Amino acid sequence: MAKFNLKSNYQPRGDQPQAIEELSTGLQRGDKHQVLLGVTGSGKTFTMANVVAQVQRPTLVLAHNKTLAAQLYGEFKELFPDNAVEYFVSYYDYYQPEAYVPTTDTFIEKDSSINEEIDKMRHSATRSLLSRNDVLIVSSVSCIYGLGSPEAYYGMLIRLETGMQLDRNALLKNLVEIQYDRNDVDFHRGTFRVRGDTVEIFPAYEEKRALRIEFFGDEIDAICEIDPLRGKVLDRLERTAVFPASHYVATRPTLDRAIREIQDELRERLTWFRENNMLLEAQRIEQRTMFDIEMIEEMGYCQGIENYSRFLDGRQAGQPPATLFDYFPDDALLFIDESHVTVSQIGAMYRGDRSRKETLVRYGFRMPSALDNRPLTFEEFEAKGIQTIYVSATPADYELRKADGVVVEQIIRPTGLLDPPIDVRPAKDQVDDLIHEIRLTIKQNERVLVTTLTKRMAEELTGYLGELGIKVRYLHSDIDTVERMQILRELREGLFDVLVGINLLREGLDIPEVSLVAILDADKEGFLRSERSLIQTCGRAARNVAGRVIMYADRITRSMRACLDETERRRTAQLAYNEEHGITPQTVKKSLRSILEDIAEKDYVELPQVAEELGDYHTPQDVKNEIARVKEEMLAAAANLEFEKAAELRDRMLELDKLELSIRNVK
């Protein structure tokens, strides 16, 4: 049985050995909840990896956004190169859920763009969980969404062995049942092709390896791993297993039972609509559901089959769906990174999903069973009972309460770096003073983060700094994950010097080149200027030996005072450690190359900085620029749940695609 094998040039130092020992002992003792209070730059990820290596248990690391998840994935991949480190986040680049707007009688079909690379990584994650123990998965809150039954997923895998008696056509039928498509021309993930007595399968969880099954009559003569592009044999296997191409698979008896239950619910729903004189809704639900039933009967699946997952899984109404947690064994370990943010996100997912689907059910677009295709509620998440370690520089009250107030502290940085000194300055001339400090920092070839209170102020400040010749970018919530990663990398590379944001410059941004963090209007008490937010924001300058923080404020608030006191406490402890061990602080050295860089390069689209006015288009490039602008608006509308507007923008984008093609043909 494979074991976690931690590989690193470093040994635990500072507070790390004590933290590793206390957390590991707590897990072995059976403690359900523990808190690791680790300051920025103290090596929390390294501590987590050491705990995993000590307890040797399948592990889920939960992050609150894709950017942080990608960063953690890269770090764990380097620490455990011989183990199954996987990445499980939403595979949608763009996702517009189906929705109905009663006020305008507008139904918006589900529309999405799937990132094939991330889809492959999701399949790789579930496959690893069901085939080995040395698995560490880094996930976003996608892990609490319905995924399909692990029993069905594992039960329908196809086991193949050299010398095995198997009819070739039976194998082809089995592949179709687990949702592989036959394609003899375009061989890609999730397809198979047939050439005489040879069947080649491209597993959904692979990228550079496919399988070649050679038959001699009704016997498997050989199994090979091949290069899918060149057809070259990479390895010869005695046995292998092919996992399904979808997480929503079911045997024929299960499908037949599900169809009967769907028909029963449909009859009940039709009776209810007719009794309430809702004839249009009755016709609508009957037409849509009967079409889905026919597709399931003939093909084994339909578009939106996840809405019938309750019947496929054999669940009762209201029972929680199967999620990634159900693919883990009982002795799994859970780390919740930046827990003060991530925990609150978990509860919010269910409420937003429920509201949209209730409208669809009420107006006959979906049956009530669709409500059970949902994320876990917070109570269901808690009921999983997995041993959990909450990791944060600023643990919230919930985590502290769960751990009975016991906290494992990690405030000493092995690098010797101190928490940045904080300078409080008057808010009256904050912009002029900020410009002066930015120019001083740029002269040192270092970067600046600026955090504002409002989106409008961030936009105006970005524009003003740009007019002064300062290379500046604005990071906001409408920017998708891949582009956000690209922006952060460009900041590190020095393509621009100043990054302005609101609430996105706090948790998890690991940028050693940043030596100045400026907090405007620091005395405006609220969520963005709470004690935890201020400590987190200040921490962004803690990876540079010259790191410093400027708070612009006309008074010292309670949150500011708490932040100043905690920072001073940590500086004092770090100074004492440095003197005792003769450590000279040095800026963190971190490679620019990201483990997910290839994905970013494939999917990154540079959006135009200035939106062009609608008008006549003279070149394909003009149309491309307009398509990019419309796409940005569409993504923003979808993120704000403005489904009707997003659908209109999507249609506009499709029209522009046709226009670009016609212009190219004319040219």
Swiss-Prot record:
The keyword Phosphoprotein does not apply. The keyword Cytoplasm applies. It comes from the Bacteria. Keywords: ATP-binding, Cytoplasm, DNA damage, DNA excision, DNA repair, Excision nuclease, Nucleotide-binding, SOS response. Residues 624-659 form the UVR domain. It is found in: Cytoplasm. InterPro entries: Helicase/UvrB_N, Helicase_ATP-bd, Helicase_C-like, P-loop_NTPase, UVR_dom, UVR_dom_sf, UvrB, UvrB_inter. The beta-hairpin motif is involved in DNA binding. Forms a heterotetramer with UvrA during the search for lesions. Interacts with UvrC in an incision complex. This is UvrABC system protein B.
